[in-house]
Structure formats: C-alpha cells, structure tokens
Amino acid sequence: VICDINQAGCDANVEEMKKMGIEAAGYAANLTDPDAVKELVNKIVEKYGRIDVLVNNAGISQKVTVADMTLDDIKRIFSVNMFGLFLITQAVCEVMKKQKYGRIVHLSSVSGKRGGGVFGGAHYSASKAAVLGFSKNLAREVSQYGITTNCVCPGLINTEIWKSMPKEQADAVIAGIPMGRPGETQEVANAIVFLASKEASYITGEEIDINGGSHMD
C-alpha cells in the first residue's frame, strides 16, 4: 500500500508494481491533515485488517541559507518532514499496539546528522535531526508492544535531483564520498526491507547510514 498527496502519482506507481506481479493499492492523502490521516489508516485497516509495516518516506526540501530563510519556510518543511510523520506514526501505532507487532522505518538523512552538505537548508537538516530524536524516544514507548522503530539516513542518492546538478557541483559532492559515487535507490531500499523484517526483531531506536562513507559515526 502506498500513499501520496497526488492520486495520479499513486496510480502510476501502483501500475508499475502490478506489472512486476506485485499486489498493490494507492491512496491519496495529505499527511499534514489529522483527519485525512485518520481516514487513510481506517481505510487500510478496513481493507487489510492490519498494518505490519510503516515506512515514512514523505519529505520536502529547499535550498536556502539561514540569512534568506523565513519562518514560513521552516514551518512548511517541518509540516511535512516532522509533523506529517508524527501524525501517521501516531495513528498507525495504535493499530500495531493492538496487534502486538509492528515495524516502523523513518527516512531521515545524512543532513540531519552532519548538518547539510548535499541538498537543502538548515531547516531541512533540523527536520531530519528531529526525526532521529523522535524515533529513539518512540522506541522507548512502543517496544513493549512488539513494535520496532528505526531510521535510515541516506547520503547522496542517484535520483533526478542528482542528475540535474551542474557538473562542477556534482564533482565537488562526489569528492567528499570515499566510495566515489552516489548511492542507488535499491541500496536504500535494501536497508529498509531489512529493518522492516522479522530478522530485525531486536533492533530498535537505531539509525543506519547509507552514504558511501561521506559521514561516519
């Protein structure tokens, strides 16, 4: 089951998955709207009876300096990256608690750990750092219900944004990556699949860096 603010985007992804032989469904919802989130979760539970895995992948960014940033800019970034994540996680956790089982994986970022350096401004980095703290605290609250909550922190990934970068800027970013290349989306997906599996049953409150060595801690 996938969710997007745009139904056409959902439908396109669902069709792509169906061609691969995957049973899929897509729902349009604004994750920053509490009522829309509740309705979404209710629809999914009505149809499938349970929710085993939640992957929080919704996010937005903006390249702007602190000097040029506005309070509205900060609110907009946090509204999706943190507040929307909170709303869907809160709603899904109630379902998972009743099941005594759940896997939650949040998409944070290397920017949330080292403070920018790839895309986005300080407000983006701050929102992704907030996700890390939220996940750790949540782990202490829900572990007793058989629910794990972890983060993945991608660095530079081979997406359309990366491909659109000017060569000079791209070369400068690559120079800071020991592996000398951007990551692939499949490499991020592999980590998410592991954290969402039963094999990761004793891992919670953790963060996995996927950045080719550009940040190590």
Predicted regions and their residues:
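Residue(s) in the substrate-gating loop at a strand-loop-helix junction
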Residues: 109
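The beta1-alpha1 cofactor-binding region of Rossmann-like NAD(H)/NADP(H)-dependent oxidoreductases
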Residues: 7-8, 28-39, 71, 186-187
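Alpha-helical segment proximal to the catalytic Tyr-Lys
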Residues: 94, 136, 140-141, 201
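Active-site helix of classical SDR
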Residues: 89, 127, 135
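Substrate-binding pocket helix/loop in short-chain dehydrogenase/reductase
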Residues: 65-66, 73-78, 162, 173
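C-terminal helical subdomain
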Residues: 144, 151, 172-203, 210-212
